């Protein structure tokens, strides 16, 4: 009986000593690294509600602190509604209606009663878009800046400006091949 107990005690102490040795070796190999804080200042989307900073005001100002009227259509909203044109996307934005599109050839939007079919108030990624269909499957968000603050983008009607942000291209090339045995 004493032999069995001594055998159990020996195995127990051997196991404890091996784990203690492994723990001391692990502590010797660890390094302390400096903490890095990452802060996101872009548009934060929580479903249909967007918070964060808006691109349309050309400043890193939170949407709630912007003294202008800014409406942002989030990616989630555009995915769920699946609009076919810019006027379909802007259907629920107040003060925005369709202008003369010359039979649906291009986008034309009236903002607060101002605007016509060629008023250059539609921007794609911050640049004036031509008289064409500007809404496509690559549209990520649509922002509407209403009122006289639209002069931030040049000579504009005081009704406002629409900024269409396209999906970001990360310059990754994808190669697909088919190999048959």
Curated annotation (Swiss-Prot):
SUPFAM superfamilies: Porins. Keywords: Cell outer membrane, Membrane, Transmembrane, Transmembrane beta strand, Transport. It comes from the Bacteria. It is found in: Cell outer membrane. Residues 62-167 form the TBDR plug domain. It is a multi-pass membrane protein. It holds the Pfam family Plug. GO terms for cellular component: cell outer membrane. Coiled coil: none annotated. Signal peptide: none annotated. Residues 180-181 form the TBDR beta-barrel domain. InterPro entries: Plug_dom (IPR012910), Plug_dom_sf (IPR037066), TonB-dep_rcpt-like (IPR039426). Belongs to the TonB-dependent receptor family. This is Uncharacterized protein HI_1466. It comes from Haemophilus influenzae (strain ATCC 51907 / DSM 11121 / KW20 / Rd).
